[in-house]
Amino acid sequence: MSEIESKVQGNYDASKIQVLEGLEAVRMRPGMYIGSTSSSGLHHLVYEIVDNAIDEALAGYCDRIQVSIEPGDVIRVLDNGRGIPVDIQEQTGKPALEVVYTVLHAGGKFGGGGYKVSGGLHGVGASVVNALSEWLTVQVHRDGKIHEMRFSRGHITQEMTIVGQTDRTGTTVTFKPDPEMFEDLVYNYETLHTRMREEAFLNAGLRITIEDERVVSANKPESERRHSMCYEGGIREFVTWLNKSKDALHSDVIYMAGQKDDSVAEVALQYNDGYNETILSFANNVHTPEGGMHEEGFKRALTNVLNNYGRKIKMLKDDEKISGEDCREGLTCVISVKLTEAQFEGQTKAKLGNSEIRTLVNNIVSDKLDTFLEENPQVGRMILDKALTANRAREAARKARESIRRKTALGGAAMPDKLRDCNENNPELTEIYIVEGDSAGGSATQGRDSRFQAILPLWGKMLNVEKARADKVYGNDKLQPVITALGAGIGDEFDPAKLRYHKVIIMADADVDGSHIRTLLLTFFFRFMRPLIEHGYVYSAVPPLYKLTRGKTTRVAFSDEERDAVSAEMRGGNPNVKIDISRFKGLGEMNPHELWETTMDPEKRTLRRITLDDAVKADETFTILMGEKVEPRKEFIEKNAQYAVNLDY
C-alpha cells in the first residue's frame, strides 16, 4: 500500500463486528447518511462499497478491486480480500454477513479489533447501500465456499445460503439503486472513473478496474468505457499527474512519510511555474475538501522550513518573513493520512479534526523537507526565489488594493463609470449582466428592467489571469470594474456576504470571440472569486440564434434543430406558407425589445448556471485552456471537438 504498511489488528471474524443501532431511519432520512438523493448521493453508494474493499487493501489482504456499471445502471463491486465474515455474531446470534448488511453502525470499524484504519461513512456504508437499493446481492468467497444473501430495500429476501465451492477469497456486491429514493438513476462513468483513479493513487500497488458495460456505451471507444489503474508510486504519481499540464520547477516530486503509533502520514509535493496552489488532502482515503489538522500541520511546517532555510542561505534578512500564501504559490501537493479514530467534522467528512495529526504532519515535513533542501540547494533556491517574487507581487497588490479603498473612502461608493446600476438594494433580488461591448451594453441598458437588473459593459482585450499574479489583476482596467461592481473583494479577502448581486450573468455572443470572453471571465472567477461559483451565483446567458417571423407572429430558436421544428409548427402543415428566418449575428444587432424578450426577461430567457462539481477537473481544464503549454491544449481540443457547438459566423 503506502511505503509504510498499514496492518490489521487482531483476527477479522464475527467477534469484530459490533452492533450499535438499527437501520430504520435510513429510508426516512437518506440525506443524513449519503448527503443527498441527487446524482451525488447515487454515486456515493458506489464509494461506500468500494471503501469497504479498500479497508481490506489497507489491512494488507486485497490488491484488486473491480467496479462495473452493468445494463440498467446496476453496480457490481468485486474484491479479492478475505471476504466478509459469515460465522455467527455473538451479540445478535445472526451471521456476521447479515448483520453487516442489515444493521446500521455494524462493521469491523468499531470495538478496537478488526481494521486499524477505515474510510467507510462512520461505519454505516454497507447497510445504508442495502437500505437504499431496490435489490442487493452479496456473495462471499471464504473458507472454500460461496455464501450468498439477497435483499430488497433493506429486507432479507434470501437468507445466507451456500451456493457453490470456490478456490479464492473475496466479496462481490451487486445492487440496483431504488427509484423510490433517487431523483437520478443514471451513473456517470467519468465521475466514477475520477474517484477510482483517486483511490488508486492513494493506495500504491492496489489495482482498481472500472468498466462501463451498459448498452448505450457499447459503441464508445475502450478509452471511454474501461480503465485499469495501478500506481506503484502512489501519491508521488498523483502529484505528477496533477502537474502534467504545467511546467514543473524541479523534476523530482518531493516525498515525505512517517508514522507514530497507529497513525501514518504521507506528503508529496512539486512546484510549478504557475501562480495557483493545489493542495489535495485525504484522511483514510476520504477527500477532505475543507482541509483540517493535516493541512494545518503541513502549511505551518512548509512556511517555517522555507523561512528558516532562506535566512540560513542569506536570501532572507533576519527580520524578513515570507507569508504562507507566498510559500505555496505554484505548489501542487497531496497529503494522505491514515489513522484509527478519524474525527471528521460533519457527516460529509469535509474536514479532519484530529489534533495529533497536525503534530505528526508538522514534524515529518519540518524534518524531511529541511533535509531535502540541504541536499538539493539548487531546488531550494528556485522555490525561495519564486516565494520572494510572489511576496513582492502581493505587496504591490496590497498597495493597489489600499489605493482603491482610499479612493472609495474619499469619493463614496466609487462605482465604475460604465455600470448602469439597478434600484433594488437587496442582493438576493438583484442581478448584473456583464456584457461584451458597448453596443450590446446600450441595448441591454435600454431593454432591461432597471428595478433589479444592472448592466456592466466590458470592452477591449481582457487579462488572462491564468498567466498573471494578483498585482496585475488589481491594476487591470478591464477587471477592476468587475471587482468594484460586485463589491466582495478578491482572493483570500473575497466575502460572499458583501456581494451586491446574487446573479452574475455573463452575456456574450455565441461566436469564437464571445466564447473567449466567457472563458476569460470564468477563469478569473475560478481563480480569484471561487466562492462565487461554489455558491451558484454565476450564470451564462443563452441568446437565441434565429428569429422566425410569419406575419405579426415572431418566434426564436436556439439551435438548427429547434429552428426547423418551430418553422414546421408555424407553417401549420402548409409548406407554401412563407416564414422569414433571420440569424442573429450578435447581441449588438438586437434592438432593446428583442434583447429583453429573448435573453433578459426572467419569464422567457434561458440561463445556464455555472457549477463546480469537480474542483480538480476544473482546475486542470482552466490550466490546459488558458495556460502556457500548447500541446495539452491541442490534445484537449482534438478530444473534445465533437462536443463543441458548430459556429459558422
Task: Label the predicted regions.
Residues R392-G411, N426-E431, G442, Q446-R448, ...:
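C-terminal interaction appendages of subunits in large macromolecular complexes
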Residues D55-E56, G83-I84, V512-D513:
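Residues immediately C-terminal
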Residues M1-D13, L23, Y47, D55-A57, ...:
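GHKL-family ATPase ATP-binding module
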Residues S15-M28:
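Mature N-terminal segment immediately following signal peptide/propeptide cleavage
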Residues I84-G107:
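Short conserved segment of the HATPase_c
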Residues M28-Y47:
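Conserved short strand/loop->alpha-helix "switch" segment adjacent to the catalytic nucleotide/phosphoryl-transfer site
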